[in-house]
Amino acid sequence: MCYFHAISGSPSTLSRNSFLLQWLEQRLAPYDIGLRSTHAIELQPFKSGASDRLTDLINTVRDAQAILLITPVPSEDWAGCMKTLLQFLPAGALQYRPLLLIGTGGNIDELPNLERSLDRELTRLNGRLALSSIHIGPKNWVFSTSRSPWLTAGTELRLHRALNQLHSLALEPVTVS
């Protein structure tokens, strides 16, 4: 089965990013595309099994059709988590796979700063942002005491369109110049 790989730069596996990953997995299922994910927090050097998880990340990224980078914007103080995680990957690891960057938290004005902060690592990894980055801030979520948070209809539509485009790009042959 083909799959997309999502890398979450959130400082916690119990965050809105986790709900976003569940949503993405459900939306990719009709395409027969699985979603594998890695949380930056799982790769901290002092965590048991971190080196095995890093090896697994390298292998799954290598075989993924596309990569989703989901990380807090710079003001959330955790964007450094994603940058550090990307530094663990060997040069060229992304092999020109189409990437979608999803910035979470903060506000949309910070998205260009997030893109710039990751640019050097993405270049080293041969990554290419294939689509315009997407921002999902607190106002893009609906919260209720009776159920898990969910995305607003407009946010779902934007993400659904981006996944359609990413899926199409993943099927195209890569031309490297």
Language-model region placement:
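Short, conserved loop/helix-junction motifs that constitute active-site signature segments
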Residues: 90-95, 123
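Catalytic His-Asp charge-relay segment
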Residues: 5, 98-100
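Short, acidic Gly/Pro/Ser/Thr-rich loop/turn segments
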Residues: 12-14, 109, 141
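An extracytoplasmic/periplasmic, membrane-proximal ligand-sensing/linker region
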Residues: 148-150
